[in-house]
Amino acid sequence: MKLKIAVQMDHISTVSIAGDTSFALSLEAQRRGHQLFHYTPDRLSLRDGKVFARIEEMQVRDEKGSHYSLGEKVRTDLSEMDVVLLRQDPPFDMNYITTTHILERIHPKTLVVNDPAWVRNSPEKIFVTEFADLMPDTLITKDPLEVAAFRKEFGDIIVKPLYGNGGAGIFHLHEADRNLASLLEMFGQLFREPYIVQRYLKDVRKGDKRIILIDGEPVGAINRVPAEHDSRSNMHVGGRAEKTELTEREREICARIGPSLRERGFILVGIDVIGDYMTEINVTSPTGVREVQRFGGADIASLFWDAVEGKRK
C-alpha cells in the first residue's frame, strides 16, 4: 500500500538529522515506498472550504550535508493526500493553533497525525494536569501572590513559560532567592499567558526521562541528564542523552495515560518523567526517536508507520 504523505514541518534544510524525529519518520516512510511531500506552515492555505499547500516532492538521505532533495512547488489540495504529518516545532502560539484549525477541515478523510483538534485542545503543560496525582505540585497563574505562597510552601521551585519549548525560559529559584519579583515582572512583559510553577524535583540531577508512546503504548525511552551547572536537561541546551529502561512506576504512568491518548487520536507522544513524576505530555512534535534507536532500542519510526498504515486500511 503506497501512501501519499505530506509533512508539515520547519524547512527540511534546517534540521539536524542526527536527532530529528521528523527526518527519521520521513526516512522510514520512504524506505516503505511511500511518496513524500514537504511544505512549511506558511505555505498552508484555506480557500472556499478547501485546504491547499504549495508542496514539493521530497527525497531524504541519511547523509549529513546532503540529506534531502526537493522537487518543484505545486499548489495541491491536501485532501488528495493519504496522510499529513503535523510536525513543525513549537512555540504553541496562534500561528500554530491556526494550522490546526485549517488541517481539521481535511481530517480524518486525510489522516492528520496527530489529530489537529486534539493537539489544539491539549497544550502540553496543561493536558498533563488531567493526571494531577502523577505530577509534582504544580501552579498555573499570573498572580504573583499565588507564586509567592507556592514558593513559601515548597521552597525550591521551577518557573517556566506555559507555551515554551526546548528548555527556553526555565528558571530554578531557591527559597531565599531574591530574584522572584524581578523574574515575574520580566515574564509579565514577555508573555501574555499565565506561566507554570512547579515544585523542584531533586531527581532531575539523575535525569529527565523522555518516554515515547505509539498509540498509547510505551515503545522506548532515553534519559536526558542536565549539564553540571544547569537545571535543564533538554538536549537543545546541553543535556546529555543516556540509555535507559522503564521502571515499574513509569510503566504504571504509561498504563494510566494510554487510554486517554488513544481516545484523542494521539499516535506519537513523548512524556517527560523526573523520578516518580510526569511533568509534560508532548503531543505537538515529540522528539527522541533517533536517540532511542542509537542506544539499541526499538525502531520507533517503523512502529509509527505500522500504526499509521493500520489506520489507513
Swiss-Prot record:
Cofactor comment: Binds 1 Mg(2+) or Mn(2+) ion per subunit.
This protein's record includes keyword DNA-binding: no
Ligase in keyword set: yes
Sorted UniProt keywords: ATP-binding, Glutathione biosynthesis, Ligase, Magnesium, Manganese, Metal-binding, Nucleotide-binding
InterPro entries linked: ATP-grasp, ATP_grasp_subdomain_1, Glut_synth_pro, GSHS_ATP-bd, GSHS_N, PreATP-grasp_dom_sf
Reported cofactor(s): Mg(2+); Mn(2+)
Pathway annotation from the record: Sulfur metabolism; glutathione biosynthesis; glutathione from L-cysteine and L-glutamate: step 2/2
Superkingdom of source: Bacteria
E.C. number(s) listed in UniProt: 6.3.2.3
Sites where the protein binds ATP: 151-207
Single annotated GO MF: glutathione synthase activity
Segments forming domain ATP-grasp: 125-309
UniProt: Mg(2+) binding residues: 280, 282
Signal peptide (residue range): none
One cellular component (GO) term of this entry: cytoplasm
Reactions it catalyzes: gamma-L-glutamyl-L-cysteine + glycine + ATP = glutathione + ADP + phosphate + H(+)
Coiled coil: none
Family label: Belongs to the prokaryotic GSH synthase family.
HAMAP family the record matches: GSH_S (MF_00162)
Protein name per the record: Glutathione synthetase
Organism: Mesorhizobium japonicum (strain LMG 29417 / CECT 9101 / MAFF 303099)
